[in-house]
Amino acid sequence: MGAAARLSAPRALVLWAALGAAAHIGPAPDPEDWWSYKDNLQGNFVPGPPFWGLVNAAWSLCAVGKRQSPVDVELKRVLYDPFLPPLRLSTGGEKLRGTLYNTGRHVSFLPAPRPVVNVSGGPLLYSHRLSELRLLFGARDGAGSEHQINHQGFSAEVQLIHFNQELYGNFSAASRGPNGLAILSLFVNVASTSNPFLSRLLNRDTITRISYKNDAYFLQDLSLELLFPESFGFITYQGSLSTPPCSETVTWILIDRALNITSLQMHSLRLLSQNPPSQIFRSLSGNSRPLQPLAHRALRGNRDPRHPERRCRGPNYRLHVDGAPHGR
């Protein structure tokens, strides 16, 4: 049965009425960019998550896919895999630079073409190149991450989005092919201290430069390894992009030790607008897709769930950074 056939009657009525209204209001939307995290029925209709797979045939997996993301990770379902190698980060020994954007949906950092940042190891059989760092956050603390652990959300989630550079020439091609993408997720809590990498992105001089949609600010001399905890475990599963077209080509790697930012930094994020300055303010917060069924997919981890009290010790629980001292 197709996605449209499975659509509930009330939702179908809302969709068709909104589509009819949208056809008479202003220019036609770009079909590749016509989506939102919340259904906007005040003015132009913009389809939220329940409608993604219905308004564009290329996004059908958003409605009918069986390996969709994000998911709720129940730790009792995680299979301990002692043969998972540590994660490895390669920056060529150089500092990261790039542009921080307010896309109207996310806070997004796009790295410059050089240096090339790669991640490998863990469940990855190939080297994957960093394409984007994306920050998702909620309107209230404890409810901003896409993924959950044991039904518990976090205030924010940082996603490092990579494509397989050994098999594909660019992100677009990789998103359509097997073993195409890898996304590392780090959870974020609100506390009295702040992760040093996130502090560079969220300090007042930086975050106020991207207050509105399409604002951008160039950053340099960033040390990406500072984003990661000193030691951590990870959980991996096969899933999808959590935005249209919801391609099921993603190896997700969830870092199991959360980062911190301050309440002031979180407040600054919530003051970012998803609209340009000429339009009414709407907070960028709440930019996450609802949870998707895990179904029969396997969850693997490098930490033995039979002994959760044990601390992560040894090289397998550290990020290996090429050229950095002490295995970092």
Curated annotation (Swiss-Prot):
One GO process term, biological-process aspect: one-carbon metabolic process
The glycosylation sites annotated in the UniProt record are N118, N170, N260
Cross-referenced CDD domains, in alphabetical order?
A: alpha_CARP_X_XI_like
Biased region (Basic and acidic residues) positions are 319-328
Top-level taxon of the source organism: Eukaryota
> Which key words tag this protein in UniProt?
Glycoprotein, Secreted, Signal
Residue span(s) of domain Alpha-carbonic anhydrase: 33-303
Q: Where in the cell is it found?
A: Secreted
SMART domains associated with the record: Carb_anhydrase
Q: Which SUPFAM superfamilies match?
A: Carbonic anhydrase
Segments of this protein annotated with the region Disordered? 299-328
Q: Tell me the leader sequence span.
A: 1-23
Family membership, please give it: Belongs to the alpha-carbonic anhydrase family.
Provide the function of this protein.
Does not have a catalytic activity.
Q: What is this protein called?
A: Carbonic anhydrase-related protein 11
Instruction: Look up and give the organism this protein is from.
Output: Pongo abelii (Sumatran orangutan)
- This protein's encoding gene: CA11
